UniProtKB/Swiss-Prot annotation:
Gene symbol of the encoding locus: tcpB
Keywords: Host cell membrane, Host membrane, Hydrolase, Lipid-binding, Membrane, NAD, Secreted, Virulence
EC number: 3.2.2.-, 3.2.2.6
Protein name according to UniProt: Probable 2' cyclic ADP-D-ribose synthase TcpB
GO molecular function: lipid binding; NAD+ nucleosidase activity; NAD+ nucleosidase activity, cyclic ADP-ribose generating
Amino acid sequence: MSSYSSNIDRLQREIARLKADDSREMSKEKQAQSKAHKAQQAISSAKSLSTQKSKMSELERATRDGAAIGKKRADIAKKIADKAKQLSSYQAKQFKADEQAVKKVAQEQKRLSDERTKHEAFIKQSLSSMRTTASATMEAEEEYDFFISHASEDKEAFVQDLVAALRDLGAKIFYDAYTLKVGDSLRRKIDQGLANSKFGIVVLSEHFFSKQWPARELDGLTAMEIGGQTRILPIWHKVSYDEVRRFSPSLADKVALNTSLKSVEEIAKELHSLI
């Protein structure tokens, strides 16, 4: 709770308590006035001097009590007025703070919307660029079942064994160690591989998250998936859901294979079953 809200709650409670005090004092004041009125009437109708003196004393006491109560009620009224002024000030500040918070949320939503629009434009541009590159080349283009996007540090630990298992099952793989030849343009061959693969396997690992080139391949695969030309198949390699989500929330929501739960052969069979 903000300091404004806590002060508003406190002042509202204090004002309510003071009003309750004033209500009790008002009842006492009415009683004192009633006593004074009765004493006044008794004095007028008294037949003896002693009765008059007694009723006069009652009138004086009731008058003093009424005056004291009136002074107390005036003090309470002043306190209520002071606290009402403070309450109004805090309420105005709270209203201004709420307005600023709403404005900040709206600005953040606009920023996220602008970022999403820019990212979508980038993906569309990437898709257009890949199509142009694929159209401009005169080389015979080979089609692949799988394009494997990975960090070089994961080759020996996992990727090489996965490629071998898939090839043993008869799958055609775009894998840089097998597909690229001396003198090839790396970017052109990667774009061709992306454009001519049915599925894009993305090996998500700590190494993958820290590399620029795999991230560029992932953008290309995302563009192809949006265009309906391929599907991204994520494999989690020694990473958690939170780590994947920090890198890409959309990838974290995809059904993924996990090297911690399945062997290389089991993963290869599941992937091959999609062809």
